[in-house]
């Protein structure tokens, strides 16, 4: 789950990380009132969307008068903000964050992320803040450092100092940087985040350290422990199909292809998409119905896939372990009738009650194309949608 910058800064502030004063706004009038309350003399008007690169896309602008705030807020609110993370369609700006202008002397990058290989928390930092870390990694990889923190020990002073030294933090700011990094680690762990990113972390002319941006991703599996974080969720920023799928406990991610995929198990789902690609097709989605699928869940899965006008065919690939093939067959038959299916459907089933499931499909009278292997299934659905 992602949240907005202003919400992330509220979390950082609660953990003692210095951030500028700011007020969210949902209308131009609220933006003006926020600027008046902050007092100026300089404000930053920031679009709030769940994507990076807002500045380059025209979503972050400096205002030096209240009239500037009013004009800029009017320009940004409601715009389709396009960045390298939104795709060509962009995202509509529905919220703004009006923030005190900052005295920027030097910008740094710092983030905490789970490193599955080392089973530790990786602190990634760079002296090249204020720009995409991907660009830095490509053009100046030597300017990125990584320090791995053992969650059983926590971030030590020595590790925090290693990060500070690695990004060339001046001596008079090292102590505060160590403090900020350790608070950032505490924040990361206690909120069950999967990513916390500050870009930029600013050092002003007085040597003071402050987070000028905040990006959070949270582990969805831990949200039951954090109702205060769930309250930050903004459904307007999420794919409507993915929101609908979550209501039925379906793991769904939209893609750009034209072949809908319904699979049980994340690994098999990814292998299915790879196989479709191998045989010249393009998957329209990732969809894992899980091990407890019912006829209702399968029907809803079909409805969600078919809401995408690009879907020209569907491939169902089931391995019957916990999930019995006859249960899926019943769900597929029910779904086909419920949605009045009009696109080609290929079904491949293996495992528990496989023969019964296949017989149910064959006896249904529906134009279902059967397949025994993944390669055969992929070949048939790719041919059917061309």
Curated annotation (Swiss-Prot):
Q: What is its EC number?
A: 6.2.1.5
| Residue ranges occupied by any ATP-grasp domain in the UniProt entry | 9-244
Gene Ontology annotations for the cellular component aspect, listed alphabetically: cytosol; succinate-CoA ligase complex
Q: Which reaction does it catalyse?
A: succinate + ATP + CoA = succinyl-CoA + ADP + phosphate; GTP + succinate + CoA = succinyl-CoA + GDP + phosphate
Q: Could you name the domain of life of the organism this protein comes from?
A: Bacteria
Example GO BP: tricarboxylic acid cycle
Molecular function (Gene Ontology), one example: ATP binding
- Secretion signal span: none
Tell me how the cofactor is bound.
Answer: Binds 1 Mg(2+) ion per subunit.
InterPro entries hit by this protein: ATP-grasp, ATP-grasp_succ-CoA_synth-type, ATP_grasp_subdomain_1, Succ-CoA_synthase_bsu_CS, SUCC_ACL_C, Succ_CoA_ligase-like_bsu, Succinyl-CoA_synth-like
**What UniProt keywords apply to this chain's record, in alphabetical order?**
ATP-binding, Ligase, Magnesium, Metal-binding, Nucleotide-binding, Tricarboxylic acid cycle
Q: Where does ATP bind?
A: 46, 53-55, 99, 102, 107
Q: Which cofactor does it need?
A: Mg(2+)
Positions binding Mg(2+) in this chain are 199, 213
Q: In which pathway does it act?
A: Carbohydrate metabolism; tricarboxylic acid cycle; succinate from succinyl-CoA (ligase route): step 1/1
Binding residue positions for substrate: 264, 321-323
Annotated family: Belongs to the succinate/malate CoA ligase beta subunit family.
**How the protein assembles, per its UniProt entry?**
Heterotetramer of two alpha and two beta subunits.
- HAMAP family assigned to the protein according to its UniProt record, in alphabetical order: Succ_CoA_beta
Q: Which NCBIfam families match?
A: PRK00696.1 (NF001913), sucCoAbeta (TIGR01016)
The record's annotation in PANTHER family points to:
SUCCINATE--COA LIGASE [GDP-FORMING] SUBUNIT BETA, MITOCHONDRIAL, SUCCINYL-COA SYNTHETASE BETA CHAIN
Q: What does this protein do?
A: Succinyl-CoA synthetase functions in the citric acid cycle (TCA), coupling the hydrolysis of succinyl-CoA to the synthesis of either ATP or GTP and thus represents the only step of substrate-level phosphorylation in the TCA. The beta subunit provides nucleotide specificity of the enzyme and binds the substrate succinate, while the binding sites for coenzyme A and phosphate are found in the alpha subunit.
- Name used for this protein in its record: Succinate--CoA ligase [ADP-forming] subunit beta
Which organism is the protein's source?
Polaromonas sp. (strain JS666 / ATCC BAA-500)
